[in-house]
Amino acid sequence: NLGEVFYRPQDIYTKMRAGDFEMADFEVNGKTYKNSFVTYENFYQNHEDAEVREKSFRSFSEGLRKHQNTAAAAYLAQVKSEKLLADMKGYDSVFDYLLAEQEVDRAMFDRQIDLIMKDFAPVAQRYLKHVAKVNGLEKMTFADWKLDLDSALNPQVTIDDAYDLVMKSVEPLGQEYCQEVARYQEERWVDFAANSGKDSGGYAADPYRVHPYVLMSWTGRLSDVYTLI
Protein backbone atom coordinates (compact mmCIF):
# COMPACT_ATOMS: atom_id res chain seq x y z
CA ASN A 1 0.00 0.00 0.00
CA LEU A 2 0.94 3.66 -0.23
CA GLY A 3 1.88 3.82 3.45
CA GLU A 4 4.62 1.23 2.92
CA VAL A 5 6.10 3.40 0.17
CA PHE A 6 6.09 6.58 2.25
CA TYR A 7 7.57 4.91 5.33
CA ARG A 8 10.18 2.88 3.43
CA PRO A 9 13.07 5.33 4.16
CA GLN A 10 12.71 4.70 7.90
CA ASP A 11 12.60 0.96 7.26
CA ILE A 12 15.75 1.18 5.13
CA TYR A 13 17.61 3.06 7.86
CA THR A 14 16.46 0.66 10.60
CA LYS A 15 17.53 -2.42 8.63
CA MET A 16 20.82 -0.81 7.65
CA ARG A 17 21.58 0.09 11.26
CA ALA A 18 20.66 -3.33 12.62
CA GLY A 19 22.15 -5.53 9.91
CA ASP A 20 24.76 -3.71 7.85
CA PHE A 21 26.80 -1.57 10.24
CA GLU A 22 30.12 -3.17 11.15
CA MET A 23 32.28 -1.50 13.76
CA ALA A 24 35.93 -2.31 14.18
CA ASP A 25 37.21 -3.98 17.34
CA PHE A 26 39.37 -1.79 19.58
CA GLU A 27 42.06 -2.59 22.12
CA VAL A 28 42.67 -1.14 25.58
CA ASN A 29 45.46 -2.39 27.87
CA GLY A 30 45.93 -5.55 25.81
CA LYS A 31 42.22 -6.47 25.87
CA THR A 32 40.22 -6.54 22.64
CA TYR A 33 36.66 -5.21 22.71
CA LYS A 34 33.99 -5.87 20.10
CA ASN A 35 31.80 -2.92 19.24
CA SER A 36 28.22 -2.60 17.99
CA PHE A 37 25.24 -0.27 18.30
CA VAL A 38 24.01 -2.17 21.32
CA THR A 39 27.29 -2.43 23.23
CA TYR A 40 28.24 1.18 22.50
CA GLU A 41 24.90 2.71 23.45
CA ASN A 42 24.30 0.51 26.49
CA PHE A 43 27.80 0.03 27.88
CA TYR A 44 30.85 1.67 26.30
CA GLN A 45 29.58 5.25 26.03
CA ASN A 46 29.34 5.52 29.83
CA HIS A 47 32.23 3.19 30.66
CA GLU A 48 34.33 4.29 33.63
CA ASP A 49 37.58 3.92 31.63
CA ALA A 50 38.20 7.06 29.55
CA GLU A 51 40.27 5.15 26.99
CA VAL A 52 37.45 2.65 26.43
CA ARG A 53 35.02 5.53 25.93
CA GLU A 54 37.29 7.33 23.50
CA LYS A 55 38.27 4.31 21.39
CA SER A 56 34.76 2.89 21.28
CA PHE A 57 33.49 6.31 20.17
CA ARG A 58 36.01 6.40 17.33
CA SER A 59 35.09 2.85 16.29
CA PHE A 60 31.39 3.74 16.46
CA SER A 61 31.79 6.96 14.46
CA GLU A 62 33.93 5.32 11.78
CA GLY A 63 31.33 2.56 11.41
CA LEU A 64 28.59 5.13 10.88
CA ARG A 65 30.70 7.13 8.44
CA LYS A 66 30.97 4.16 6.06
CA HIS A 67 27.22 4.37 5.50
CA GLN A 68 26.78 8.14 5.60
CA ASN A 69 25.71 8.47 1.96
CA THR A 70 23.07 5.74 2.24
CA ALA A 71 21.75 7.23 5.48
CA ALA A 72 21.65 10.70 3.91
CA ALA A 73 19.76 9.41 0.86
CA ALA A 74 17.21 7.63 3.08
CA TYR A 75 16.77 10.78 5.16
CA LEU A 76 16.27 12.95 2.06
CA ALA A 77 13.63 10.51 0.80
CA GLN A 78 11.88 10.74 4.19
CA VAL A 79 11.88 14.55 4.09
CA LYS A 80 10.50 14.59 0.54
CA SER A 81 7.74 12.10 1.39
CA GLU A 82 6.70 14.19 4.41
CA LYS A 83 6.68 17.34 2.27
CA LEU A 84 4.52 15.62 -0.35
CA LEU A 85 2.04 14.36 2.25
CA ALA A 86 1.86 17.78 3.91
CA ASP A 87 1.05 19.42 0.57
CA MET A 88 -1.49 16.75 -0.40
CA LYS A 89 -3.34 17.17 2.91
CA GLY A 90 -3.35 20.96 2.73
CA TYR A 91 -1.04 21.80 5.63
CA ASP A 92 0.93 25.04 5.66
CA SER A 93 4.18 23.22 6.38
CA VAL A 94 5.70 19.85 7.20
CA PHE A 95 5.91 20.99 10.82
CA ASP A 96 2.15 21.51 10.97
CA TYR A 97 1.50 18.15 9.29
CA LEU A 98 3.69 16.19 11.73
CA LEU A 99 2.44 18.07 14.79
CA ALA A 100 -1.21 17.48 13.86
CA GLU A 101 -0.78 13.74 14.40
CA GLN A 102 0.15 14.50 18.01
CA GLU A 103 -2.51 17.20 18.46
CA VAL A 104 0.15 19.83 19.16
CA ASP A 105 -0.02 23.29 17.62
CA ARG A 106 2.92 25.12 16.07
CA ALA A 107 3.07 27.75 18.83
CA MET A 108 3.68 25.11 21.48
CA PHE A 109 6.36 23.44 19.35
CA ASP A 110 8.17 26.74 18.77
CA ARG A 111 7.96 27.51 22.48
CA GLN A 112 9.62 24.20 23.35
CA ILE A 113 12.47 24.82 20.91
CA ASP A 114 13.01 28.31 22.35
CA LEU A 115 13.04 26.93 25.90
CA ILE A 116 15.60 24.29 24.98
CA MET A 117 17.92 26.71 23.20
CA LYS A 118 17.63 29.67 25.57
CA ASP A 119 16.87 28.27 29.02
CA PHE A 120 17.89 24.61 29.01
CA ALA A 121 21.17 24.97 27.11
CA PRO A 122 22.98 26.88 29.91
CA VAL A 123 21.74 24.34 32.47
CA ALA A 124 22.98 21.46 30.30
CA GLN A 125 26.37 23.13 29.98
CA ARG A 126 26.68 23.52 33.75
CA TYR A 127 25.61 19.89 34.22
CA LEU A 128 28.27 18.60 31.82
CA LYS A 129 30.93 20.67 33.56
CA HIS A 130 29.81 19.16 36.87
CA VAL A 131 29.97 15.63 35.40
CA ALA A 132 33.51 16.35 34.21
CA LYS A 133 34.52 17.64 37.64
CA VAL A 134 33.00 14.69 39.52
CA ASN A 135 34.78 12.23 37.22
CA GLY A 136 38.11 14.04 37.34
CA LEU A 137 38.19 15.09 33.68
CA GLU A 138 40.26 18.12 32.74
CA LYS A 139 38.48 18.30 29.39
CA MET A 140 35.17 16.76 28.37
CA THR A 141 34.92 15.50 24.79
CA PHE A 142 31.87 14.28 22.87
CA ALA A 143 32.87 10.74 23.86
CA ASP A 144 32.28 11.65 27.53
CA TRP A 145 28.80 13.18 27.23
CA LYS A 146 26.98 10.03 28.34
CA LEU A 147 29.22 9.45 31.35
CA ASP A 148 27.24 8.70 34.50
CA LEU A 149 27.20 11.33 37.22
CA ASP A 150 27.50 8.43 39.67
CA SER A 151 28.32 4.93 38.38
CA ALA A 152 26.48 3.48 41.39
CA LEU A 153 23.25 4.65 39.74
CA ASN A 154 23.73 2.20 36.86
CA PRO A 155 25.18 -0.97 38.44
CA GLN A 156 25.56 -4.44 36.98
CA VAL A 157 22.37 -6.50 37.29
CA THR A 158 21.74 -10.17 36.54
CA ILE A 159 18.68 -11.31 34.61
CA ASP A 160 17.34 -13.08 37.70
CA ASP A 161 17.70 -9.88 39.74
CA ALA A 162 15.96 -7.99 36.93
CA TYR A 163 12.98 -10.33 37.12
CA ASP A 164 12.80 -9.77 40.89
CA LEU A 165 12.86 -5.99 40.45
CA VAL A 166 10.11 -6.15 37.84
CA MET A 167 7.88 -8.24 40.10
CA LYS A 168 8.43 -5.86 43.02
CA SER A 169 7.55 -2.89 40.81
CA VAL A 170 4.15 -4.34 39.86
CA GLU A 171 3.15 -5.53 43.36
CA PRO A 172 0.96 -2.43 43.98
CA LEU A 173 -1.16 -3.42 40.97
CA GLY A 174 -2.53 -6.50 42.72
CA GLN A 175 -2.16 -10.27 42.77
CA GLU A 176 -3.99 -10.95 39.51
CA TYR A 177 -1.79 -8.52 37.61
CA CYS A 178 1.37 -9.96 39.18
CA GLN A 179 0.37 -13.49 38.20
CA GLU A 180 -0.06 -12.39 34.60
CA VAL A 181 3.29 -10.59 34.55
CA ALA A 182 5.03 -13.62 36.11
CA ARG A 183 4.17 -15.61 33.00
CA TYR A 184 6.76 -13.74 30.95
CA GLN A 185 9.55 -15.32 33.02
CA GLU A 186 8.00 -18.77 33.36
CA GLU A 187 7.09 -19.00 29.66
CA ARG A 188 10.21 -17.19 28.41
CA TRP A 189 8.55 -14.33 26.59
CA VAL A 190 11.74 -12.21 26.58
CA ASP A 191 14.53 -12.47 24.02
CA PHE A 192 17.58 -11.10 25.85
CA ALA A 193 20.47 -11.99 23.52
CA ALA A 194 22.36 -9.03 22.02
CA ASN A 195 22.90 -10.82 18.72
CA SER A 196 24.56 -9.33 15.68
CA GLY A 197 21.94 -7.79 13.41
CA LYS A 198 19.51 -7.17 16.24
CA ASP A 199 18.33 -3.59 16.68
CA SER A 200 19.07 -1.68 19.86
CA GLY A 201 16.40 -0.63 22.33
CA GLY A 202 13.37 -2.61 23.44
CA TYR A 203 10.39 -3.77 21.42
CA ALA A 204 7.20 -5.76 21.86
CA ALA A 205 5.81 -8.13 19.23
CA ASP A 206 2.11 -8.97 19.43
CA PRO A 207 1.30 -12.01 17.26
CA TYR A 208 -2.39 -12.69 16.70
CA ARG A 209 -3.98 -14.73 19.52
CA VAL A 210 -0.60 -15.26 21.20
CA HIS A 211 0.95 -13.56 24.23
CA PRO A 212 3.34 -10.67 23.49
CA TYR A 213 7.08 -11.18 23.10
CA VAL A 214 9.66 -8.69 24.33
CA LEU A 215 12.77 -8.16 22.21
CA MET A 216 15.74 -6.41 23.80
CA SER A 217 19.53 -6.55 23.89
CA TRP A 218 20.65 -7.30 27.44
CA THR A 219 23.95 -5.80 28.58
CA GLY A 220 23.56 -6.38 32.31
CA ARG A 221 23.05 -2.79 33.45
CA LEU A 222 20.28 -1.28 35.55
CA SER A 223 19.19 0.75 32.52
CA ASP A 224 18.21 -2.56 30.89
CA VAL A 225 15.85 -3.24 33.78
CA TYR A 226 14.05 0.03 33.03
CA THR A 227 13.61 -1.13 29.43
CA LEU A 228 12.26 -4.47 30.62
CA ILE A 229 9.77 -2.82 32.98
Predicted regions span which residues?
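Hydrophobic alpha-helical segments with strong N-terminal bias
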Residues: 74, 203-204, 214-218
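Short pre-active-site segment immediately N-terminal to the catalytic Zn-binding motif
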Residues: 152-165, 172, 185, 209-229
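His/Asp/Glu-rich acidic catalytic environments and adjacent acidic regulatory segments
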Residues: 1-107, 111, 115, 164-187, ...
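A metal-dependent hydrolase signature that marks the N-terminal structural subdomain at the beginning
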Residues: 95, 101-104, 108-177
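Polar low-complexity intrinsically disordered regions enriched in Ser/Thr and small residues
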Residues: 22, 33, 139, 200, ...
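Intrinsic disorder/low-complexity segments enriched in polar/charged and small flexible residues
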Residues: 147, 186-187, 191, 205, ...
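Short acidic (Asp/Glu) and glycine-rich catalytic loops that position anionic groups and cofactors
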Residues: 36-37, 142-147, 208-212
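Catalytic zinc-binding patch centered on the HExxH motif and its immediate surroundings
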Residues: 155, 190-211
